[in-house]
Structure formats: structure tokens, C-alpha cells
């Protein structure tokens, strides 16, 4: 038995969906532990492109249970659309479970999210506008609606009256937006509750029962390390904790239950939305990475900002997550480049530093110090084992592993499942040094 956490080691969009899908073959239970519909992952199965925001990738495997944990925030409208999409594609969703204590994104959360972002003007933080921040804010203020509340008419009416009155006051008086009607929300969300009721469980008890029965549990994070509310580039962050420690809180397990943490990182770096990005590229190479990597957000459709691999944030991710190994994705995107650069340190006000400054004002001033490596200028898309890779591609991977001081377990070379080199299965393989 092995319990593994999969986290993003950059600013999200690292390809966690594919890696989680790959590892789900060996997992009995997959748990999504934080975030909401602001995250998205794309999975390609038999030439079908499936885009999911809430449901774990493991849903594609018939014998794998998939839990949406207590640390998530659930938009039931979008969740039901995902369920319907999976059913239409012939996928069995009987293994889907939703924590009764997950908080619910309400219509006023989405409206307020968009209104507050518009009100920030030039100081916008790049929110997806999906209501995630306001939902987590209500959770912290103990004013939120939970999944269990959607299952009872009187309960929902009782818990929604005060927050709705407060939100309508904000909508009318601050933003000049028409207030929402209690009756309309009750009717809509009670219907959602009825449709979801058969999937609702005590998430923590379910996970601990699986652990007691020696099941393999995979904890799936959303977003990435640098978007963590406490350890990311605040305020340009999400409203939850994507780092590995968030798995314990969001799933309701102790740290001793976790056997291994695997970080997912692109062979280059991307960021969507606002905030400092030291290795960001401009011009033709940026366009090439964006086009070859199809760098457009699954959730927003926004074009992602692209840059060279940043070893400073990589080492930071290793530290705050306690990474045991790494999955490097989209190596094939670099195939046509004759030269590739990797950031090995920053210049901050004339001083060379090799640590990540979590103060966004300092990070804005950081200038990357690069190491240049030779490209391989041939396709890696059909490589299925390390020995198939061009020598310069191997050199590049070894350099990343040495820089981050963590072994590489998986290399992804395209969107399809089979475009992957698995050096070691992080669930079933022995815990040992791999590609260094």
C-alpha cells in the first residue's frame, strides 16, 4: 500500500491531470483535496478530449473511487455538467463521492467575484471569476453553505438567509447590481442537492476506511505551489492550499498517512493571470512555446504567459512540499529549439540569490540568471524509454534533477496516455534514486 500526493510545482497548469490519470491506474481511491472550478485538467483518452474541473481524473477507471474532499469548494451546476458529460461518453460515475462538508459556491459568490475584480482596475489579481475566493471567504467567516445543506429544504433556507441578505446589500449598495431572490436560489439549489444526494458521503471516514483496508490512495491537488494562499506569490494566489500539507487538511488525514509526494513541473514555466514571473519570455520563443504547448487555460481560455524553466521556484517547491520525486511534462514542446535556458539563481538589487523571495515586490525586481544548454532539435514524441531520448534531452533532464536535488520518476512527451516514460511507478515502485 502507498498513499501519494500529487502537487503542482509551479504556477499551476503543469499537467497534473495527465499524471494523476496515469497514477490512478494503480490507485484504489483518488481524492481531490482543495480548490474548485477555478482549476481544470485535460485528459486525452482514445482521441477523446475530456476537460474536468472538479471530478478527479481517476473517474475514468471503473474500479477507482473518486472523492471530492472537504477542502474543496463545489459549484454544483458545473459539477452536474461534468457528470452528464462523463455519462454521455459512456463513463461509469458510480464511484464518485462528494464530502458532505464541502462548501458550495453560490450565485452571489460568482457575481461578487467578477464585480470585485472589475473594481480593482489596474490592481486586479487575475481571478477566474468563478466565485472561489468569496466562497472560501464565507467558509472562513463561518457563513458558508455546505453540500449537506442542499439536502434539506428547511436547513438550506435557515443557513442561507443571513449571507444572502449581506450579499444583496453589497450587490445593491456597493456595485449597483440587482439583488438575488431567496426563492429562486432555494428552488435551484435544492434540485442540485437532490441530483447529487446519492454521491454524498462522510469523506474523512471513507478515506480512513480505505486506509485501514490497505488501499492505495492518491491525493490530487489543484493549481500549484506558487499559487498557495500562504506560501505563494501573494496576493496573486488562489484562496486555498495546493501544497502537499493541504492534502492533510482538505482530506482530513494526518501527515503520517502520506508515504510519498510527487511534484509535477513543465519542462519550461507558465503562468496565467497577473503577478511577477522572473523568467517570462517575449517575442518568437514565447509564441513558439505557447503554440506548441497549446498554452490556453482549461478554465478561462486565457493565453498563458510562457518562460524558461525556473530552478529557483523548483527548489522552493521541493522544500515546501517535501517532494520525493518529480514528473516532468511537455518535454516535447522544446524539441525544435537549438538552445534552452534554465534559471539557476536571481539577481535582486545587485545581489545573487538562490532562494525564492515570497514577497511579490521583491520578486518583481528579480532578474533571472541563466544556464544555457544545447537543444536536441528532433522529435521526442515517440520515445517510450529513457534510452530512446536524444542525448541532449537526457542532459537537460539530468540538469533539472541535479538543480532541484530530486529524482525524476516520469517524463511526459505529449497529451496522450502512451506518450509517457515511466521510470518508476511512485505508487508501487521502491523508494529509490531515479534519474539524477
Swiss-Prot record:
It comes from the Bacteria. Keywords: Cytoplasm, GTP-binding, Ligase, Magnesium, Metal-binding, Nucleotide-binding, Purine biosynthesis. The active site is at 13 (proton acceptor), 41 (proton donor). GO terms for cellular component: cytoplasm. Binds 1 Mg(2+) ion per subunit. Pathway: Purine metabolism; AMP biosynthesis via de novo pathway; AMP from IMP: step 1/2. Mg(2+) binds at residues 13, 40. Substrate binds at residues 298-304. GO terms for biological process: 'de novo' AMP biosynthetic process; IMP metabolic process. The keyword Nucleotide-binding applies. Plays an important role in the de novo pathway of purine nucleotide biosynthesis. Catalyzes the first committed step in the biosynthesis of AMP from IMP. Homodimer. HAMAP family: Adenylosucc_synth. This is Adenylosuccinate synthetase. It comes from Prochlorococcus marinus (strain MIT 9215). The gene is purA.
Amino acid at each position: 500500500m502507498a498513499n501519494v500526493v500529487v502537487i503542482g510545482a509551479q504556477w499551476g497548469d503543469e499537467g497534473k491531470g495527465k499524471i494523476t490519470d496515469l497514477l490512478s491506474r494503480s490507485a484504489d481511491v483518488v481524492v481531490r483535496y482543495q480548490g474548485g472550478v477555478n482549476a481544470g485538467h485535460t485528459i486525452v483518452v482514445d482521441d477523446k478530449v475530456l476537460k474536468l474541473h472538479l471530478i478527479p481524473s481517476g473517474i475514468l477507471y471503473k474500479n477507482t473511487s473518486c472523492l471530492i474532499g472537504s477542502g474543496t469548494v463545489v459549484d454544483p451546476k458545473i459539477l452536474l455538467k461534468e457528470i452528464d458529460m462523463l455519462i454521455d461518453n459512456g463513463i461509469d460515475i458510480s464511484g464518485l463521492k462528494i464530502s458532505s462538508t464541502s462548501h458550495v459556491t453560490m450565485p452571489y459568490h460568482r457575481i461578487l467575484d467578477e464585480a470585485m475584480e472589475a473594481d480593482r482596475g489596474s490592481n486586479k489579481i487575475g481571478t477566474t471569476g468563478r466565485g472561489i475566493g468569496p466562497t472560501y471567504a464565507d467558509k472562513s467567516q463561518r457563513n458558508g453553505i455546505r453540500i449537506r445543506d442542499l439536502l434539506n429544504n428547511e436547513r438550506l433556507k435557515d443557513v442561507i438567509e443571513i449571507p444572502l441578505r449581506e450579499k444583496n446589500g453589497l450587490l445593491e449598495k456597493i456595485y449597483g447590481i440587482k439583488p438575488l431572490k431567496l426563492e429562486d436560489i432555494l428552488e435551484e439549489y435544492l434540485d442540485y442537492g437532490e441530483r447529487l444526494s446519492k454521491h454524498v458521503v462522510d469523506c474523512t471516514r471513507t478515506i480512513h476506511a480505505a486506509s485501514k483496508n490497505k488501499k492505495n490512495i492518491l491525493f490530487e491537488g489543484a493549481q500549484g505551489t506558487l499559487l498557495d494562499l500562504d506560501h505563494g506569490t501573494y496576493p496573486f494566489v488562489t484562496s486555498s492550499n495546493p501544497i502537499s500539507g493541504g492534502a492533510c487538511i482538505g482530506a482530513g488525514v494526518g501527515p503520517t498517512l502520506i508515504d510519498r509526494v510527487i511534484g509535477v513541473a513543465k519542462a519550461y514555466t507558465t503562468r496565467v493571470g497577473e503577478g511577477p514571473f522572473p523568467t517570462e519570455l517575449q517575442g518568437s520563443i514565447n509564441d513558439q512555446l505557447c503554440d506548441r504547448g497549446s498554452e490556453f487555460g482549461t478554465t478561462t481560455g486565457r493565453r498563458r504567459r510562457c518562460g524558461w524553466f525556473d530552478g529557483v521556484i523548483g527548489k522552493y517547491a521541493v522544500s515546501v512540499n517535501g517532494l520525493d520525486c518529480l514528473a516532468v511534462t511537455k518535454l516535447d514542446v522544446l524539441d525544435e529549439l537549438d538552445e534552452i535556458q534554465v534559471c539557476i539563481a536571481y539577481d535582486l538589487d545587485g545581489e545573487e540569490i538562490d532562494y525564492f523571495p515570497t514577497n511579490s515586490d521583491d520578486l518583481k525586481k528579480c532578474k533571472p540568471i541563466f544556464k544555457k544548454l544545447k537543444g536536441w532539435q528532433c522529435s521526442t514524441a515517440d520515445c517510450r524509454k529513457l534510452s530512446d531520448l536524444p542525448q541532449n534531452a537526457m542532459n537537460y533532464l539530468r540538469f533539472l534533477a541535479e538543480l532541484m536535488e530530486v529524482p525524476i520518476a516520469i517524463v511526459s512527451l505529449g497529451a496522450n496516455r502512451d506518450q509517457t516514460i515511466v521510470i518508476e511507478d511512485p505508487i508501487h515502485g521502491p523508494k529509490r534514486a531515479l534519474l539524477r
